Regions:
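Membrane-interacting alpha-helical segments
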Residues: 1-7
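Long, structured ligand/cofactor-binding scaffold of large enzymes
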Residues: 8-11, 15-144
Length: 144
């Protein structure tokens, strides 16, 4: 699932209320990073003032997007966890192993051949566990 409008609507419908609770507990304005992190706490009962480097916090992300260069290890760890599917919408984007040299066409062809084993693994694991797979040339996960 690449774009889930209902998920976005639900998140923003509850956003102001969640931020209000956080401000009430912390008694101060919040940075953008704090707003993002506190609205993604795994359990609302965890709401407290956290100390950097001291406290451990569990989060529940809305989605997971992985790039090809690091998704390999993440997916191996996921497989070892013994889960049947991802808990949140997840995607693998094959864009980081493509080296820009001669142009889009030749560079994608070279990357596809050079990284065939990696791409095959990522595609197969993604298919097995219901994870979206964006093949080389399908787009980039973020802007340079």
């Amino acid at each position: 699932m690449v774009y889930d409008l209902d998920m976005l609507k639900a998140f923003y419908a509850s956003f102001e209320k969640k931020i209000g609770r956080v401000r009430a507990v912390l008694q101060r304005p919040l940075t953008l990073a704090e707003k993002i992190l506190y609205t993604h706490l795994y359990d609302d009962a965890q709401l407290k003032n956290y100390e950097r480097g001291e406290d451990y916090v569990n989060f529940r992300p809305d989605r997971v997007a992985m790039q090809d260069a690091t998704a390999q290890m993440a997916l191996l760890q996921f497989i070892n966890a013994g889960k049947d599917s991802a808990a949140v919408p997840s995607t693998v984007h094959c864009d980081h192993l493509i080296q820009a040299y001669k142009g889009a066409g030749p560079d994608i062809a070279t990357a596809t051949e050079t990284n065939r084993e990696v791409y095959d693994f990522l595609r197969d694991v993604s298919s097995r566990f219901g994870i979206g797979f964006w093949k080389p040339g399908a787009g980039i996960i973020h802007q340079v």
